[in-house]
Curated annotation (Swiss-Prot):
It comes from Photobacterium profundum (strain SS9). It is found in: Cytoplasm. NCBIfam families: deoC. This is Deoxyribose-phosphate aldolase. It is an enzyme of class 4 (lyase). Pathway: Carbohydrate degradation; 2-deoxy-D-ribose 1-phosphate degradation; D-glyceraldehyde 3-phosphate and acetaldehyde from 2-deoxy-alpha-D-ribose 1-phosphate: step 2/2. One of its GO terms (molecular function) is deoxyribose-phosphate aldolase activity. Its EC number is 4.1.2.4. The active site is at D102, K165, K199. It comes from the Bacteria. Keywords: Cytoplasm, Lyase, Schiff base. CDD domains: DeoC (cd00959). It holds the Pfam family DeoC.
Length: 257
């Protein structure tokens, strides 16, 4: 198997196959769940709005892939600084049956100089999650600077994040190699690689993109670190490209998350 094919297979099994669109329906989410089951393996998770969790859970069970996890989003995509609302949404997501919650860090508050609200929001959302995985979206494309990306990553980890995630996919700049390098280095420098994972989201569209992101993780944190409890790709259009690279199916037109 070529290096690119090996990376494509690895990336497929690390995908949070995502649909977070305003026009999502039960039918679209069911189709997404069907796509999570492929001839070469299943994606790690599907990522959907909370109201679609029951439909996804039923479909994943019926198609014989109950191990595909269900991730959802809260405080999304705006990243407002109302802790009470973020916690209420997170509790509701847990009640719906989410296996994982991706919450948006109040990044605009941090840009304005308020670090405390972000720490407290993540801490309280993690308390609401209990054992359920909490991924914190820091919105690197809006934070922009290395100092702010580093600070948001550190605050999230100190507050209890299980993963730090680059982006919502709803702003002009999403996952970049530069942001990934900063965030992975924070995980290394804080010595939390055993307990904290990383998720680039938005903008990872090809097997070559995924290969480059994985090579960076291997370089910074070691070749066996990026398993499906420490590394995810948040993507939709990536799947068709990975399957095409692996000789499965036709490559769809590129677009989306």
């Amino acid at each position: 198997m070529s290096d690119l094919k090996a990376a494509a297979l690895r990336a497929l099994k690390l995908m949070d196959l995502t649909t977070l669109n305003d026009d999502d329906t039960d039918e679209k989410v069911i189709a997404l769940c069907k796509n999570a089951k492929t001839a070469v393996g299943n994606t790690a998770a599907v990522c959907i709005y909370p109201r679609f969790i029951p439909a996804a859970k039923k479909q994943l069970r019926e198609q014989g892939t109950p191990e595909v996890r269900i991730a959802t989003v809260t405080n999304f995509p705006h990243g407002n600084d109302d802790i009470e609302i973020a916690v209420a949404e997170t509790k509701a997501a847990v009640a719906y049956g989410a296996d994982e919650v991706d919450v948006v860090f109040p990044y605009r508050a941090l840009i304005a100089g308020n670090a405390d609200v972000g720490f407290e929001l993540v801490k309280q959302c993690k308390a609401a999650c209990g054992d359920i995985l909490l991924k914190v979206i820091i919105e690197t494309g809006e934070l922009k600077t290395e100092a702010l990306i580093k600070q948001a990553s550190e605050l999230s980890i100190k507050a209890g994040a299980d993963f730090i995630k680059t982006s919502t996919g709803k702003v002009p700049v999403n996952a970049t190699p530069e942001a990934a390098e900063i965030m992975l280095t924070v995980i290394k420098d804080m010595d939390v690689a055993k307990t904290v994972g990383f998720k680039p989201a938005g903008g990872v569209r090809t097997a070559e993109d995924a290969q480059a992101f994985l090579a960076m993780a291997d370089r910074i944190l070691g070749g066996d670190w990026a398993d499906n409890m420490h590394y995810r790709f948040g993507a939709s259009s990536l799947l068709a490209n990975l399957l095409h690279t692996l000789g499965e199916g036709e490559e769809a037109a590129q677009g989306g998350y």
